[in-house]
Amino acid sequence: MAATAVNGVAGTSSSGSAAASGAILQAAAGMYEQLKGEWNRKSPNLSKCGEELGRLKLVLLELNFLPTTGTKLTKQQLILARDIQEIGAQWSILRKDIPSFERYMAQLKCYYFDYKEQLPESAYMHQLLGLNLLFLLSQNRVAEFHTELERLPAKDIQTNVYIKHPVSLEQYLMEGSYNKVFLAKGNIPAESYTFFIDILLDTIRDEIAGCIEKAYEKILFTEATRILFFNTPKKMTDYAKKRGWVLGINNYYSFASQQQKPEDTTIPSTELAKQVIEYARQLEMIV
């Protein structure tokens, strides 16, 4: 009789727990619909989306919906969690929050790769995986870039527009074809790619500017604008101020104070820098 009572209590507890989980799941689905409604607006309120994402993350943890918990999840649960985190990754880009983007992508890769046999392919999968590749390039994490690339089918690498874009950029960087990298900004597969490609272009500009400072005693304003791939004089002026360049007589930037003294020079760095810039010019003419 005691055993029967215990079993009855256990059964009641189990059914009560299931009912509670069902109620929380229903609440999570409702919160997701609110998030999706705000996110799909022409100009979403990013602060409101962030608050919704924060609440949903707590709910997902409570329901053990995240793939790191080891809980066996249903298809419906997995899709709900994946969809929420896809919005989170895209929201992170608009907020320019790189650590947040990286965290969301770490979770999403579990859904894209570990559960690929159980789930229908997400419409945003290739876009976000391509964004992740571009993120790694922008951070100069080339080894990780190739590790992530190895997880993708050869067909996607060769034909998918979202994956091909960062792959092409990496090839241009390996070749030193910086002009092609700058031209690629006008051919991005999605607006969200702008954030990371701008970071990459800023890094390239800094490298070219460093070469200019070592290779030239002075350079004409218009020449610097062209070499650094600026399309307006104002952008060139703003960049020059950031680097501490001062525009002097006859519209020249002077770098005499940054030149190496002959006796301190152990390698022909000035000549090498000039060759690099001349090579970039020749590539620009070819394109």
UniProtKB/Swiss-Prot annotation:
Keywords: Isopeptide bond, Phosphoprotein, Proteasome, Ubl conjugation. Pfam families: CSN8_PSD8_EIF3K (PF10075). Residues 99-268 form the PCI domain. InterPro entries: 26S_Psome_Rpn12, CSN8_PSD8_EIF3K, PCI_dom. There is a cross-link at K234 (Glycyl lysine isopeptide (Lys-Gly) (interchain with G-Cter in SUMO2)). One of its GO terms (biological process) is proteasome-mediated ubiquitin-dependent protein catabolic process. GO terms for cellular component: cytosol; nucleus; proteasome accessory complex; proteasome regulatory particle, lid subcomplex. The modification Phosphoserine is found at S43. Belongs to the proteasome subunit S14 family. Component of the 19S proteasome regulatory particle complex. The 26S proteasome consists of a 20S core particle (CP) and two 19S regulatory subunits (RP). The regulatory particle is made of a lid composed of 9 subunits including PSMD8, a base containing 6 ATPases and few additional components. Interacts with DDI2. Interacts with TASOR. Component of the 26S proteasome, a multiprotein complex involved in the ATP-dependent degradation of ubiquitinated proteins. This complex plays a key role in the maintenance of protein homeostasis by removing misfolded or damaged proteins, which could impair cellular functions, and by removing proteins whose functions are no longer required. Therefore, the proteasome participates in numerous cellular processes, including cell cycle progression, apoptosis, or DNA damage repair. This is 26S proteasome non-ATPase regulatory subunit 8.
